[in-house]
Amino acid sequence: MVKQKKLSIFSLKTSIIFILTFFLIILYFYFSSYFEINNVSKAYITNQGDNTVSIIDLETLKILKTLKVGVAPLGITILQEKKLVFVGNVGTDDISVIDAVNDTLIKTIKLGTAPLSLASNSEETKVYVTDWFQNNVLTISADEMKVTRRLKVGVTPSGIAYNKKYKYQVITNRDANTLEIYNEHDDLVKKIETGNHPFGVYSEGDFAYVANVYDDSVSIINLVDWSKYEFMVGAHPYNVKVHNKTAYVTNTIGDTITVYDLGTKKIIKILDTGETPENLDFNNKQNLLVVTNWGSDSISIFNTEGFRHIKEIKTGSQSRSFGDFILQ
């Protein structure tokens, strides 16, 4: 009887251990899968021609999902820590907010005007939107999901970038051929002349970089002493970004990317893209350059270490993504 009781206790303990082990294994695989899914680097491509966003896994280089948003999506910015994607819809005068964990549309923010380019501050509390038609920059609270400020700026504000070092909003005024710089309190710090028809802009450290569409050039502006110099690129440059001390410029006529070494001040490579390349962004995990091709409804992907063309992926109609569009 005692022996049987001991066996029963042993069997019970064994069963409990087995159940706990099984439960822990399930938890392990669940959370491993969860973190794996949420650590995937993705590109969010706004397709202005069919009112969608193509979501692309940058590890497998495959489209994960095509999401319907507002009419004529163009500008974009991503809050990396909050995992939120803000998409500007020109045709419906609003912003679509996407949850980047589940890739679902969670909010539509009415603006009452057409959004062009988007950027966000480093604290991820504010999203800035250029209002081309009314010459404003709108500030959206990322927490309240509503417009909290309309700042009057120069004529036809086009591109906008956020400088983390100085907490500046850096804005191109296309038809005025100027760059305007505002601090975190929306005070004008400086207005400076650029080349002809400035559009895309990028800013980090002590510099701002501006693509001058009609001059086939890029202006580099020192944010400390306000000196500047220019270098020539391909025909009709649309946007510029810097990665590892190298400037990359989209040339919409000629279908190329100019790769410019900022140290030697020389062009080191010309990359062939799809038709009418407009915007670009970088994936840090796989060292990828991703370029949106408005004319061929696609993205071109390159390795930034050897400038090797990896793949062209068909997306939606008129792919643009004016802003930061890669979730790292």
Regions found by a protein language model. Give the residues of each.
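Predominantly soluble domains enriched in secretory-pathway, periplasmic, or organellar proteins
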Residues: 2-4, 8-328
